[in-house]
């Protein structure tokens, strides 16, 4: 009888071990977006960038992204600047109060700026004219967040700048020296919806290989 119990116990042990092995194999893994055609980035120095900021920002546009691997949002921006602030390579962006991305930027210490190829102009247009409050813009556009240093860039980008916030300040009625700009950009349905200016130190520059 003891032999029967020993044999049964051995069979149960083998069955349990096999089940655990299968579970280990099929257990969902924490996935980081991977595609060989858009994931090959290398790090360069900021001064090695060959951008013309006037054409890249004003005409080419870029995506500002904040959040992390679990949750993030991005939006198209055509106002901003690149330069040096407090002795650091820096980027300046402007975000209106009602944008979903602003909530992510305010909640984190870092954000990214991503420049995409011209072929993504349609997607950039969508990202700028729709809000993350109304749905998943990543899914709607077919773009993908690219986790980097605790924040997210855009996987399809040619260039990603990882920035750490140094300063933020909200524009208001008192900051305008040219009243015509306030009337043009902050009147009608945008009355009171002023931009917040963020200046971020550029901590990393990634370019597609």
Regions found by a protein language model. Give the residues of each.
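Basic, polyanion-binding surface patches
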Residues: 34-209
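Intrinsically disordered, low-complexity segments enriched in serine/proline and basic residues
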Residues: 9-10, 18
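Short, Lys/Arg-enriched N-terminal segments with co-localized hydrophobic residues
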Residues: 17-38
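Intrinsic-disorder-associated, low-complexity terminal segments enriched in Asp/Asn/His/Tyr and depleted
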Residues: 2, 11-13, 33, 37
């Amino acid at each position: 009888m003891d032999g029967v119990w020993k044999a049964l116990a051995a069979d149960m042990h083998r069955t349990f071990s096999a089940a655990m092995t299968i579970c280990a194999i099929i257990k969902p893994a924490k996935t980081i977006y991977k595609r060989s055609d858009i994931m090959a980035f290398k790090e360069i120095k900021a001064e090695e960038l060959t951008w013309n900021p006037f054409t890249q920002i004003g005409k080419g546009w870029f995506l500002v992204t904040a959040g992390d691997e679990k949750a993030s949002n991005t939006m198209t921006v055509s106002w901003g600047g690149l330069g040096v602030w407090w002795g650091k390579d820096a980027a300046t962006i402007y975000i209106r109060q009602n944008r979903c991305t602003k909530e992510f930027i305010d909640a984190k210490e870092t954000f990214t700026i991503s420049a995409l190829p011209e072929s993504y102009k349609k997607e950039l247009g969508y990202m700028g004219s729709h809000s993350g409050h109304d749905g998943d813009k990543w899914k709607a556009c077919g773009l993908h967040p690219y986790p980097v240093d605790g924040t997210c860039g855009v996987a399809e980008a040619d260039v990603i700048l990882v920035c750490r916030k140094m300063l933020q300040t909200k524009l208001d009625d008192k900051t305008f020296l040219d009243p015509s700009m306030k009337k043009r950009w902050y009147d009608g349905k945008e009355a009171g919806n002023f931009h917040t200016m963020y200046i971020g130190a550029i901590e990393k520059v990634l370019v597609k290989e």
